[in-house]
Structure formats: C-alpha cells, structure tokens
C-alpha cells in the first residue's frame, strides 16, 4: 500500500490558501491546488498499511480511504475515482465540505498525540 516508509519520510502538509483579503474580491477558487499538485503523491504515500483501517470506520459515508490513497500514490486516477464513487455519489462536493473525521481515526494521529504527550506538550 503506497510507500511503506512514506509516513516516516513526509510530514502532513495542506494546500496553501489565498489570503482572505484577496478572497473577498471574487468568487474564484481560493485553495491553491496547482501549487500542491506535485505533493499529492507524496502526501498519499503517508497512508500506512496499518491492518485495521480506523480511518475507514471514522468516515461517516464509508469511504475506502487506504485504497483511494494507494491509487492516488500510483497515479491511477480513474481507479481512485471508482473507489470514491463506490461509496459516495458526489465526492467532488463532499470533498470540499468534509471535516475529515478520518484523520482523527488514523493511526498516525494516535501516535502523534502520544508522542506530544510524552514530550510534555
């Protein structure tokens, strides 16, 4: 699944967004996906083959997240679309408004909290 050491090599990154003072001038896209494009494969490689995908359980619509991330990592965009659309009729809409409860279910998130706890933060 993806890159076995991806979660060790790459930190979590989010796409950049336009400054709100620029956003209010029009109704255009404010997430700068073009700049993030080269990082998509890197970020999808962070998905581990954890055995029990708690992220899948945490998703209210049941998206098959590990398989989707693997398809993105391999540049299999049609397969990724098929995986998403098998559980979600409108992934292009829900992806914009989703609060990402899968991330809190991810084993990486659990380990991050634990490591911060041990550091006394």
Where are the language model's segments positioned?
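Ferredoxin-type iron-sulfur electron-transfer modules and their immediate structural context
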Residues: 1-121
């Amino acid at each position: 699944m993806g890159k076995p050491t991806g979660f060790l090599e790459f930190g979590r990154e989010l796409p950049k967004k336009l400054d709100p003072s620029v956003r209010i001038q029009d109704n255009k896209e404010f997430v700068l996906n073009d700049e993030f494009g080269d990082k998509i494969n890197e970020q999808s490689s962070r998905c581990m083959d954890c055995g029990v995908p708690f992220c899948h359980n945490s998703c209210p619509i049941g998206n098959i997240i590990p398989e989707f991330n693997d398809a993105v990592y391999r540049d299999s965009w049609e397969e990724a679309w098929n995986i998403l659309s098998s559980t979600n009729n409108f992934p292009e809409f829900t992806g914009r408004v989703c609060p990402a409860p899968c991330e809190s279910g991810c084993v990486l998130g659990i380990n991050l909290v634990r490591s911060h706890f041990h550091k006394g933060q």
